[in-house]
C-alpha cells in the first residue's frame, strides 16, 4: 500500500511493505529500526509466521526488540499482517 489502497500480495511482500512504511515513519521522527524497543505482529494466519519472520529479521539487528506475534480473527481490508512498534526516540 503506497497510495492508501491495498493491493493483494504475498505475506513476504506485505511484511516488506509494512516494514518499509514503518521505516519511513521512524525516519520522519529522526529514528530508525535500532530505536524500536517492542513490536506487536498480528497475522491473519499463524501459518504465515515463518515467512513473515524471515522478512522481519532483515530489518532488525541484535539485540532485536521484544515482540509478541499472534493470530487474529481478521484484519481490516483483508490484509495478512499488521505490525505496531514502540520506539525510544533519540535525544
Model-derived segments and spans:
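Short, polar/acidic, helix-capping and beta-turn segments at strand->helix junctions
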Residues: 1-91
Amino acid at each position: 500500500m503506497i497510495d492508501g489502497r491495498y493491493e493483494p500480495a504475498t505475506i513476504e511482500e506485505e511484511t516488506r511493505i509494512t516494514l518499509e512504511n514503518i521505516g519511513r515513519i521512524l525516519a520522519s521522527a529522526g529514528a530508525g529500526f535500532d530505536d524500536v524497543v517492542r513490536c506487536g505482529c498480528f497475522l491473519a494466519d499463524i501459518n504465515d509466521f515463518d515467512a513473515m519472520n524471515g522478512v522481519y529479521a532483515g530489518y532488525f539487528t541484535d539485540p532485536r526488540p521484544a515482540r509478541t506475534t499472534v493470530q487474529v480473527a481478521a484484519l481490516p481490508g483483508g490484509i495478512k499482517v499488521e505490525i505496531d512498534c514502540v520506539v525510544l526516540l533519540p535525544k
